[in-house]
């Protein structure tokens, strides 16, 4: 007897909101990057809170102290679960990610294509590290695939971006 694989077509995030009180507003460039990160995440993702029936879900992100808050709800606003993740494991990764992104944007103006490609490979490697860390931190709480982890890490990074 085989067990059917779960139907994940409804296990997804359909909307993301940011807690303006804890995250705050930023300049137009950062707001634009946040909007892109949210769009990319909502466009394609796998997001299944452990123990919850199938979605779709909405996600409200905020910062409480030194923690990232994931407030997960149903489309109608009914609470599903809230998780608080320490930001500490992400601080070094986000800092390294911004440093290499700065190098990348500077290199685009003056460096050779080989140098730009090498920097971009490093940037992708750090992004992958952040994505794996996020998957590990959410393990047992929310099931996400690697691409969703990448999109969420992008959004978390943009939330840290002070410009």
Swiss-Prot record:
Top-rank taxon, per record: Bacteria
Tell me, what's a Pfam family for it?
Answer: UPF0262
**InterPro entries given in the database record:** UCP032146
Family, as annotated: Belongs to the UPF0262 family.
Protein's name according to its UniProt entry: UPF0262 protein RPE_4483
Organism encoding this protein: Rhodopseudomonas palustris (strain BisA53)
């Amino acid at each position: 007897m085989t067990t059917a694989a779960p139907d994940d077509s409804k296990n997804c995030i359909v909307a993301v909101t940011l807690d303006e009180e804890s995250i705050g507003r930023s300049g137009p460039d950062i707001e634009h990057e946040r909007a892109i990160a949210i769009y990319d995440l909502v466009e394609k993702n796998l997001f299944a809170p452990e123990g919850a029936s199938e979605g779709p879900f909405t996600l409200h992100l905020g910062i409480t102290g030194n923690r990232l808050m994931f407030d997960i709800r149903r489309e109608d606003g009914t609470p599903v679960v809230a998780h608080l993740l320490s930001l500490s494991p992400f601080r070094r990764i986000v800092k390294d990610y911004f440093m290499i992104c700065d190098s990348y944007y500077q290199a685009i103006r003056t460096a050779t294509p080989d140098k730009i490609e090498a920097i971009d490979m490093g940037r992708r490697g750090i992004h992958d590290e952040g994505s794996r860390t996020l998957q590990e931190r959410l393990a047992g709480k929310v099931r996400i695939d690697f691409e969703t982890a990448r999109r969420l890490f992008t959004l978390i990074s943009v939330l840290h971006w002070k410009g």
